[in-house]
Amino acid sequence: MLSPLATPAATRDVLEEHGLSTKHALGQNFLVNDAILQKIVELAQLDASDDVLEVGPGIGTLTIALLKCAGRVVSVERDADLPAVLEDTLDPWADRFALISKDALELTEEEVHLALAKCAVSSEGEGRASRAVPHDANSPVGCSPKQDCLSTTMLRRTLSD
């Protein structure tokens, strides 16, 4: 299993532990299927030298899977309630994880580089981007592959029946 949070029960437990629920106004959806995580990681073709920019980490379900495969992960989250959750769920990887608390549409390349610099592990590989469900696939992210911040972009789309 790539992430222990990839079940409905585990996700519900984490949210309840922090007194939270899904905020549909923010377009929140939580990954609860490890097979989907495996497919995302497989398609991203990550290795320990890669840096990953994740937009919308939620409670950290995909983030855990990314951290198991990549060098460093920087996540951008606009929900002010989730940093405390991420601090708990990602504690074992705290030295390789950085969080930027803001809307990804306002993200700058400099902020990503500063966040990566805070991570202990040095990486010389390619950067990858994982874009979470809340963000419209047609909306731009402030730090894009065109800006040489990341060389490869992988979008995660809403997966429904």
Residue ranges and their predicted role:
Residues M1-G127, D136, P140, P145-D161:
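Catalytic cores of RNA-modifying enzymes
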